[in-house]
Amino acid sequence: MNRCWALFLPLCCYLRLVSAEGDPIPEELYEMLSDHSIRSFDDLQRLLHRDSVDEDGAELDLNMTRAHSGVELESSSRGRRSLGSLAAAEPAVIAECKTRTEVFQISRNLIDRTNANFLVWPPCVEVQRCSGCCNNRNVQCRASQVQMRPVQVRKIEIVRKKPIFKKATVTLEDHLACKCETIVTPRPVTRSPGTSREQRAKTPQARVTIRTVRIRRPPKGKHRKFKHTHDKAALKETLGA
């Protein structure tokens, strides 16, 4: 089983090399990884293109033939050393999705957000967190079981050049179990221009009507002296007199 897991690291290196050159990665490789169909080195060799390996070997032979006689011995000795180091190297093992010990920095915001004139001791602690890689690009190593653990730290304040020690409690999050979960990415909502226009047409628009209000002035009243006079002719005579 360990040998099977060790096959994935060279395959990942190959995928990175292909993506760096600009060629699209075949979907069959991801399907085989997700179906756990790679069980031996023969299955891995079927996925890798042997033409690229042959081209690398031909290029190496061409460079060796073009070199001078003195450089030929040096390049051949380097090639032998590289082959010997490859033979002595141990097979790579995939980093499984599981809990590992990580270092967590205790920031001052976790203790007091209103004050920054203090120190925290210890400044960092160890926590258990999920890490590792999964077989498919659409899944990610995440925590399936979490436990909250309170710890006690020291809050050191400096007052009048003297340290004052206080106790504070910080809650840490430890991962107890991990598993590879599918990554859910929200799909962007695309709206056609015709749909937005139709919605605007259906939406009733509020119309603002401005009305002009005329203020009527009260009628001019007669002079108190001539209120009893109703005849216009007599009124003119009186005013004319």
Curated annotation (Swiss-Prot):
Q: Origin, by domain of life? A: Eukaryota
Task: Give site residues, Involved in receptor binding.
Answer: R108, I111
Check the record and name the InterPro entries matching this protein. Answer: Cystine-knot_cytokine, PD_growth_factor_CS, PDGF/VEGF_dom, PDGF_N
Q: What is this protein called?
A: Platelet-derived growth factor subunit B
Subunit text: Antiparallel homodimer; disulfide-linked. Antiparallel heterodimer with PDGFA; disulfide-linked. The PDGFB homodimer interacts with PDGFRA and PDGFRB homodimers, and with heterodimers formed by PDGFRA and PDGFRB. The heterodimer composed of PDGFA and PDGFB interacts with PDGFRB homodimers, and with heterodimers formed by PDGFRA and PDGFRB. Interacts with XLKD1. Interacts with LRP1. Interacts with SORL1 (via the N-terminal ectodomain). Interacts with CD82; this interaction inhibits PDGFB-mediated signaling pathway.
Classification from the root reads: Eukaryota, Metazoa, Chordata, Craniata, Vertebrata
| Region called Disordered, residue ranges | 217-241
Q: Which residues form the signal peptide?
A: 1-20
What does the similarity note say? Belongs to the PDGF/VEGF growth factor family.
* Basic residues: bias regions: 217-230
Tissues in which the UniProt entry reports expression: Localized to vascular smooth muscle cells. Also weakly expressed by cortical interstitial cells but absent in tubules. Up-regulated in areas of renal fibrosis. In mice with unilateral ureteral obstruction, an increased expression in interstitial cells and in some tubules observed after day 4.
Annotated localization: Secreted
